Amino acid sequence: MLAATVPAAAQAPAAPPSPPPSSVPVPGDLELSKLVWSTLAAIDAANEAGNYSVLRDLASPQFQAMNDAAKLTQVFASLRASRLDLSNTLLLAPTFTATPRFVQPGILMLKGFFGLRPTPVAFELYYQWVMGRWKLAGVSITPASIASQEPALSQQPAAAPPRRRN
């Protein structure tokens, strides 16, 4: 399993989720999709160029403080080596596997996947509300198996065909 994850501080805490602070807007469906698309496009461009400075500059101040461009190069090395084309995620709407929620005041978690073939892309993204904008605060991207992303089919055996009477 390939993963790119940063930073631990942005991961979901053990405490139950808190409601969003009143000054933090709750994004609508289109805004949620745009956050995911823009993040994956930025990561794809960084992987192509081997330069993560723009991705870092687009992120939250806490993310920037914890990750310089060299560290991000290391963090995303396995994803880059997999040559997974994240630009294909721009062709589909993300499928959310969990309801987008606030895991800390001002920290929004989005979890889901893109049902691409042959390799779906799973994501877990964290955003922080900073100066009137959502900024990347944490990221995990993994290639996923198709079977793990599709709803389980019924395990009932097929009915035997009726017997013909002569």
Model-derived features: where do they sit?
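Short solvent-exposed beta->alpha transition segments
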Residues: 26-38, 45, 49-107
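Alpha-helical interaction segments
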Residues: 42-45, 124-125
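Localized chelating/binding microdomains
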Residues: 43, 64, 86, 137-141, ...
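Exposed beta-sheet edge and beta->alpha loop/turn motif
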Residues: 94-166
